[in-house]
């Protein structure tokens, strides 16, 4: 009985021992096939080498899904700052974070415990990246203070996030017909350079494709909240290329132009009206005031165009400056008319004296002919001593007419009436112009722009 019990225990011990040997042998065989050693995990360096190193078989020159469906790249941008908008060169400057996301199944992993890996920017050269460029870019630069402003993140499922900080100068064709009450639309176009739509497609991120930093302000514009997102697919001789775009609406603020252009020109026009209250005999004062205001207005008009491109159409500021210059010049011409009318009495009296002199000479000649022609003496007169002399009509200088003062007063009153009418007509005409001007550009055309 005792011996049977010992045999049973020995058999059980041998069975368990054989099972353990088999398990260890199986684990070793499995680990050797998978390239792992028992009780050993990969280091980060070994893992990256295995994932995208030379021994991994990963080729950064070949896109994901090679010879398969195109790679979908979702993009979004975060605007850090919106720089100067320049009318002369028609461009704007912007600082952004550009983020691109795509899926590369070759970078999927399960051997590493982390759900995602934030890698050094130097690893960007080891993976495939979309060949994105900005179609309307005029200048750009990367940022490397204190290190390269780039981010590379790879998720377990092979999703890649590539973020980079850029400062861009982008072209922005502007319509300045309503300047400085205009609303400009500036675009940003993201396009593939070498991959056609058979290989690569850009799309906007569905959640927050374009984000703006809080408190972002521009010196002369208000950045509208509504932004238009769309596609701008390009067709070239080399193929059809994917392109996406965003349109920014910038409404110009008038504060600067009111202070620097509109108010000074308005005051110059009002100053030109002061001559209507100056005595018409003070010619030096009125002429000097008129010429000064004309020259000042000309300088002001030239200054308003200095910061603008030489376009072929008329801008709103051009109309304002032209009308102001017209009013100032008209005020100078008004004094010329006043001075001319006030001096007309002298010419009138001179002509009147000439006419009277001619009439008197004709009367004397006619009278002398009548008195002496009957005696056959013609124009000769016989004196008491018997001598004959030729009768010559008297030609005394005419005396000024008795109503000369009345005539002078009549013309002076006409000149004064011109000044009196101008004092009311000029401000009224300028007021009517202002009403039409501001209604047209601030209400009618402004609404048309917003409808578009």
From Swiss-Prot:
Keyword Transmembrane among record annotations: yes
Cystine connections: 172-186, 232-243
Activity regulation information from UniProt: Channel opening is triggered by extracellular glycine. Channel opening is also triggered by taurine and beta-alanine. Inhibited by strychnine. Inhibited by picrotoxin.
Subcellular location: Postsynaptic cell membrane; Synapse; Cell membrane; Cell projection
Any GO BP: modulation of chemical synaptic transmission
GO molecular function: extracellularly glycine-gated chloride channel activity; glycine binding; glycine-gated chloride ion channel activity; metal ion binding; transmembrane signaling receptor activity; transmitter-gated monoatomic ion channel activity involved in regulation of postsynaptic membrane potential
Binding, glycine 1: 99, 163, 238
Residues the record marks as site: Important for obstruction of the ion pore in the closed conformation: 295
Tissue-specific expression: Detected in the retina inner plexiform layer (at protein level). Detected in neonate retina. Detected in brain. Detected in spinal cord, with higher levels in the dorsal horn.
Disruption phenotype: Loss of glycine-induced currents in cortical neurons from 17 dpc embryos. Still, mutant mice are born at the expected Mendelian rate, are healthy and fertile. No effect on glycine-induced currents in cortical neurons from seven day old mice. Baseline nociception is not changed, but mutant mice show increased hyperalgesia in response to mechanical stimuli during later stages of inflammation caused by zymosan injection. Knockout mice show impaired learnig, short- and long-term memory deficits, and impaired long-term potentiation in the prefrontal cortex.
Reactions accelerated catalytically: chloride(in) = chloride(out)
Keyword annotations of the record: Cell membrane, Cell projection, Chloride, Chloride channel, Disulfide bond, Glycoprotein, Ion channel, Ion transport, Ligand-gated ion channel, Membrane, Metal-binding, Postsynaptic cell membrane, Receptor, Signal, Synapse, Transmembrane, Transmembrane helix, Transport, Zinc
Signal peptide bounds: 1-27
Transmembrane parts of this sequence: 257-278, 284-304, 316-336, 421-441
Residues the record marks as carrying a glycan: 72, 103
One GO CC term, this protein: glycinergic synapse
NCBIfam families associated with the record: LIC
Protein's UniProt name: Glycine receptor subunit alpha-2
Originating species: Mus musculus
Lineage, uppermost ranks: Eukaryota, Metazoa, Chordata, Craniata, Vertebrata
